[in-house]
Amino acid sequence: MAVILILISHAYSMTEAGMFSIGYAIALLGMTLAKYGQRNFQVTDIAGNYSFAEYRYSRWITVILTMLFMTLYLLIQCGMGKYDIEKILIVFFLCLWKQIDAIEDVFYGMYQQKGRLDIGAKRYSERLIFSTVLFCVLISLKIRFLMAVLLETILSIVMAAFLIQKDKESLLLEVDNKCRLIHVRRLMVICLTLCISSTLAVYIGNLPKYFIDVLLEDSIQARFGYLIMPAFVIMVLSTVIFQPVIRDMGEAVKERDYKKLSGYVVRQIIYIALITSI
């Protein structure tokens, strides 16, 4: 995001950079809401109490509901005269762009659940590099910013679909694809508290951006985006070191090996402290 934000401010103006900054913040909130806090639950479901089809079905529900909610929010902003049509479309396409992460997440969660986090990490890295390079190229061409966001969204969706399909066929043979609606409903209820906590964490973290969006200009939003970048980097790095051990922590809880679990927690605290100090 840092590289993209800097390129936007150079290729266009601080106004476009500000629109990207608030659009990305709203899209990140939408992505977190769509993920529904389900990844950690899915990965630690070692016993396979819920099938992959049930996780996938519930994810489609949350993605669709999130996009409906985001559309309603943008229409309200338009009706109140706070967003013009271009800003609405930019934010909408950025929200759609980040929903790719939510859809990918259920597949990569299944890979990690089956002990193949390496596949998910590899495919996610490939798609992320593709999306970042593509966005940088589109920005460098200095085409209309709205068109750059639209092309980025469409091509990223195509790339994500290709990468998911690449491994899905072989790995889905090993999973239960039976979908029971009562299990889907139960998943939605069980993960609700996880969804609320994760969404609130993202919302509170980006709260200054929302206030700037209401009270100040988009150019101020861009400047604030530069200032808050170190905190964003720390958050991303913390996720990177935490995500790989979720399954192992789940196994430790299942086996009631609390000594092993405490070791994981202590190591995570040390890693985060080291990253923060750097």
Regions found by a protein language model. Give the residues of each.
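Helix-loop interface residues and adjacent transmembrane-helix termini in multi-pass membrane transporters
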Residues: 11-14, 49, 113-114, 142, ...
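Alpha-helical transmembrane segments of multi-pass membrane transporters/permeases
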Residues: 48-53, 92, 96, 110-136, ...
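Membrane-water interface segments that mark the loop-to-transmembrane alpha-helix transition
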Residues: 23, 28-78, 85, 89-90, ...
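Hydrophobic alpha-helical transmembrane segments
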Residues: 21-24, 84-95, 122-169, 228
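C-terminal transmembrane helix end/exit motif
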Residues: 39, 106-113, 117, 139-140, ...
